[in-house]
């Protein structure tokens, strides 16, 4: 009861400012918070597609033509359209996989993928810093799981040996799960080294590339493309919520595996089909990413200037080698709240913070992005 009282007091104090703040205006480098125009550091609109005129036009036309209700029903029953199929074909072709399956949401989609792929006899080996959606998916797994040290290939090899022995005993398989780009630190999963371990161990590899799709690899094809190991990734998951500036996700791989997911993923079997405006909008976003590699090139120009400037000004950005740009500071919740207030009230900068338990105790990460205001950001 005491903990509930503390929680309730915190929620009452924090709501609307530290938690659930309301940003207003067009999505961009400057937005309005509590009536004041601010430089916005808290966006993941990597390629700037959120307000692209062709994207806004496609979204509006999709809504005008079909409304938000169509198609009615789950895809297996009455929610299938030629547009859903077209988007799946184009996504699979773009990332270099045989087939793809659309998902309504990224977070619950990943949970359902893991639930669908595994039996109690199967064994999972996953990175210690895997995203919360992966952890929640593994909570549904009734079999054994092993965690390896973040990006530590010696640790992975050791856990793979344990997993292999157990899987052979149980007559199951081994699934390794990692990320293409880790969203808190910005470092890349060592996909090339993980794929190389297939020479010594039998396992399938599932990669969550939410932050890599559109930003990494040839033309934005993702982190597996960056490492040249697309064929070695068995199950590739991507979301529309980052580079695509939309909603939804997709999973891709060999056709037999995608069909297994298509006919068995509970989050899709028992859910309404992705609404038509989202599908029409995603087709336009993919077209722009595919036909305009300069969007990715511009992103990386900004990233290089931003990260170099931050380091030159004495900020610790860790080991990021992606557009994710964390700034590591020492402190806990009191220091983080003071910093949020200082940035917003005294400097006109809207910024959100990440603290323990999302990151190690005693650290703070301002979640930050900026497109057009690099000098102000670095200062």
Predicted regions located by residue number:
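Active-site phosphate-binding strand-loop segment of PLP-dependent enzymes
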Residues: 146, 150-207
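PLP-dependent enzyme catalytic core of the Aspartate aminotransferase-like
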Residues: 53, 57, 61, 65, ...
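Conserved N-terminal alpha-helix of the aminotransferase class I/II PLP-enzyme fold
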Residues: 57, 64-105
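Conserved PLP-binding catalytic core of the aspartate aminotransferase-like
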Residues: 19, 297-307, 311-347, 363
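Conserved PLP-anchoring active-site segment centered on the Schiff-base-forming lysine
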Residues: 113-132
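Conserved small/polar residues in nucleotide/adenosyl-binding loops
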Residues: 1-9, 370-377
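N-terminal "arm"/small-domain region of PLP-dependent enzymes with the aminotransferase-like
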Residues: 7-69, 203
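Conserved core segment of the aminotransferase class I/II
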Residues: 235-237, 244-296
């Amino acid at each position: 009861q005491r903990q509930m009282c503390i929680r309730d007091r915190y929620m009452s104090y924090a709501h609307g400012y530290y938690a659930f703040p309301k940003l207003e205006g067009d999505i961009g480098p400057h937005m309005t918070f509590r009536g004041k125009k601010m430089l916005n550091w808290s966006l993941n609109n990597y390629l700037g597609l959120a307000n692209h005129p062709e994207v806004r036009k496609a979204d509006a036309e999709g809504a005008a033509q079909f409304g938000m209700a169509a198609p009615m029903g789950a895809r297996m029953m009455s929610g299938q359209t030629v547009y859903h199929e077209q988007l799946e074909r184009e996504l699979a072709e773009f990332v270099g996989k045989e087939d793809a399956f659309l998902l309504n949401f990224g977070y619950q989609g990943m949970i359902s993928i893991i639930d669908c792929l595994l039996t109690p006899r199967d064994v999972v080996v996953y990175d210690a810093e895997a995203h919360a959606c992966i952890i929640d998916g593994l909570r549904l797994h009734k079999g054994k799981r092993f965690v390896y040290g973040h990006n530590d290939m010696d640790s992975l090899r050791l856990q793979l040996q344990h997993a292999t022995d157990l899987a052979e005993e149980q007559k199951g398989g081994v699934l390794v799960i990692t990320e293409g780009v880790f969203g808190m630190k910005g470092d890349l999963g060592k996909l090339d080294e993980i794929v190389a371990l297939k020479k010594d161990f039998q396992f399938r590899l599932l990669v969550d590339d939410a932050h890599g799709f559109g930003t990494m690899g040839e033309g934005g094809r993702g982190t597996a493309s960056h490492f040249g190991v697309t064929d070695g990734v068995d199950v590739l998951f991507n979301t529309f919520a980052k580079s695509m500036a939309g909603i939804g996700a997709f999973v891709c791989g060999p056709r037999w595996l995608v069909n297994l997911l298509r006919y068995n993923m509970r989050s899709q079997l028992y859910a309404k089909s992705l609404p038509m405006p989202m599908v029409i909008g995603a087709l336009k976003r993919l077209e722009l990413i595919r036909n305009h590699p300069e969007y990715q090139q511009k992103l990386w120009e900004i990233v290089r200037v931003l990260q170099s400037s931050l380091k030159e000004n004495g900020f610790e950005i860790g080991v990021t080698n992606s557009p994710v740009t964390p700034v590591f500071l020492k402190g806990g919740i009191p220091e983080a709240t003071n910093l949020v207030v200082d940035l917003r009230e005294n400097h006109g900068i809207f910024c959100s913070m990440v603290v323990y338990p999302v990151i190690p105790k005693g650290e703070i990460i301002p979640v930050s992005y900026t497109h057009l205001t690099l000098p102000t950001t670095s200062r």
